[in-house]
């Protein structure tokens, strides 16, 4: 559909651009978000680095709370909940690192998080293990190098080894979770 505010040549260029996966963040899309005044959400690897670099616990908590989302909670639960067993072998993963600069064409973990159930034991038993591992490798190859590395630390449940002070207790406190990584139930302040 032609935009009446654009010159004819610009409309033709837009029409010629290929339609890509909705989870891809193109340079043009990132610029449009920036120009619209909407903040561009941080990559999860950037959030982890901010937690790592925060000087004290209150600042670490603030980083997590400021970037709170359902997808971030899902990823961090997978990183720290000992009841979650990943169906992906632990350790290094043989994948081709996406060398595209951050902010150019690659998928982002916040949008890929909804697929993580496929890589958890009991999440999707219809997928053969070889296919599961291939899908995981493809996911890693679509992410920026930093986010892929972060996802590998999540699956290996070694986030605290790489990011100082990024612990299960910090995450539970930030999101008001109990020891089962669930939202704490509010007790009524009056007798029932």
Language-model regions: role of each:
Residues 1-192:
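N-terminal nucleic-acid-engaging modules of covalent nucleotidyltransferase systems
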């Amino acid at each position: 559909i032609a935009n009446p505010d654009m010159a004819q040549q610009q409309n033709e260029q837009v029409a010629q651009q290929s339609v890509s996966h909705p989870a891809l963040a193109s340079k043009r899309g990132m610029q449009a978000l920036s120009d619209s005044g909407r903040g561009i959400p941080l990559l999860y690897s950037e959030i982890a680095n901010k937690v790592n670099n925060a000087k004290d616990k209150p600042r670490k908590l603030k980083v997590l709370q400021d970037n709170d989302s359902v997808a971030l909670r899902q990823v961090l639960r997978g990183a720290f909940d000992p009841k979650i067993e990943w169906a992906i072998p632990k350790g290094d993963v043989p994948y081709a690192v996406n060398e595209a600069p951050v902010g150019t064409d690659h998928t982002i973990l916040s949008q890929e998080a909804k697929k993580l159930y496929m890589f958890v034991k009991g999440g999707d038993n219809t997928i053969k293990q070889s296919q599961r591992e291939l899908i995981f490798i493809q996911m890693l190859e679509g992410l920026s190098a930093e986010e892929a590395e972060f996802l590998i630390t999540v699956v290996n449940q070694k986030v605290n080894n790489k990011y100082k002070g990024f612990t299960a207790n910090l995450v539970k406190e930030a999101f008001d979770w109990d020891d089962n990584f669930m939202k704490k139930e509010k007790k009524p302040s009056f007798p029932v």
